[in-house]
Amino acid sequence: MSKIFVNPSAIRAGMADLEMAEETVDLINRNIEDNQAHLQGEPIEVDSLPEEIGKLNINEAKPQSFENNPIDIDGRMNEDFQMKEVEDPSIQFQSYLDNIGIQIVRKMKTGERFFKIWSQTVEEIISYVGANFPNPSGKTTESKSTQTTPKKVKPEPPSAPTEKPEQLSRTSMAPETTSGPLALDWSATNDDDDVSVEAEIAHQIAESFSKKYKFPSRSSGIFLYNFEQLKMNLDDIVKEARGVPGIIRLAKEGLRLPLRCILGWVASSHSKKFQLLVGSEKLSKIMQDDLNRYMSC
């Protein structure tokens, strides 16, 4: 007959756990009793009350009729309304977002693509906000100046549309520069994007944030560079990456992005070290080749 040997340390640990559990149960019971002491019918000693409270007299006054005092009625209604207020909706929304985050992690562990998960999650969040945070209807936003006699305002002539400096700098890039790549082919334009597109771009960049890519150097050699060396926030990198032609379309379709092309695009504008090391002509060629290869897939 075989004997089972039990380690004495395991027994002592189990006994300690049992003692801690008993102490926890006793503490909970004491807290419950303390919190429900006012329900036990225990008398309150008047002598133990503060002096100011002891001087108070309790008179059985007749209840005032609210019919003759409409102000009291309104006050009572306001108090009742405040008593019936529900929990702060922002707290409920925060717990809802926490649950959404847990669901996203679980789906990603099963191998489902982040772009598909995020697009479904955005729709769920929009429907939740629309159901629990309705827009107040019937409210107008008229200014007080409309109550006075309106003054005739001369219409201003329409001004010519102005482009952002960033767009001007992108479109007016010279075919050859000393500190950056050549101008890329803008035949593949970027359409209006949404939050899910930015999320897909950020997801793919984050996956390869420390991966090093080969770039041509000025000395006819190569050097390695990655997104970490940019010393930039991921959000800023995503904003710059949106300027690469065709990136938004690839992200919308959930396809792989030309990360080396994106890295070269961002680094050529924000990294002085990269500008000093890279060969501009060769960089432009490999960026264009990467972009054409990914767009043709």
UniProtKB/Swiss-Prot annotation:
Keywords from the UniProt entry: Chaperone, Host cytoplasm, Host nucleus, Host-virus interaction, Inhibition of host innate immune response by virus, Inhibition of host interferon signaling pathway by virus, Inhibition of host STAT1 by virus, Inhibition of host STAT2 by virus, Interferon antiviral system evasion, Phosphoprotein, Viral immunoevasion, Viral RNA replication, Virion
Segments carrying the region annotation (Disordered) are 131-187
- Molecular function via GO: RNA-directed RNA polymerase activity
PTM comment: the record says: Phosphorylated by host PKC and by an unknown kinase.
Q: Which residues carry this modification: Phosphoserine?
A: S210, S271
Q: List the GO cellular component terms.
A: host cell cytoplasm; host cell nucleus; virion component
- Motif Nuclear export signal, per the record, lies over 49-58
Example GO biological process: symbiont-mediated suppression of host type I interferon-mediated signaling pathway
Task: Decide whether keyword Phosphoprotein is in the record.
Answer: yes
UniProt short sequence motif Nuclear localization signal, positions renumbered to this chain: 211-214
InterPro entries reported in the protein's UniProt record: PP_M1-like, PP_M1_C, RABV_P-like_C
Q: Where is the composition biased (Polar residues)?
A: 134-150, 168-180
Give the quaternary structure.
Homotrimer when phosphorylated. This trimer is stabilized by binding to the L protein. Binds soluble protein N, and ribonucleocapsid. Interacts with host STAT1, STAT2, and PML.
Q: What does this protein do?
A: Non catalytic polymerase cofactor and regulatory protein that plays a role in viral transcription and replication. Stabilizes the RNA polymerase L to the N-RNA template and binds the soluble protein N, preventing it from encapsidating non-genomic RNA. Also inhibits host IFN-alpha and IFN-beta signaling by binding and retaining phosphorylated STAT1 in the cytoplasm or by inhibiting the DNA binding of STAT1 in the nucleus.
Q: Which family does it belong to?
A: Belongs to the lyssavirus protein P family.
Name of the protein in its database record: Phosphoprotein
> What lineage is on file?
Viruses, Riboviria, Orthornavirae, Negarnaviricota, Haploviricotina
Question: What's the encoding gene here?
Answer: P
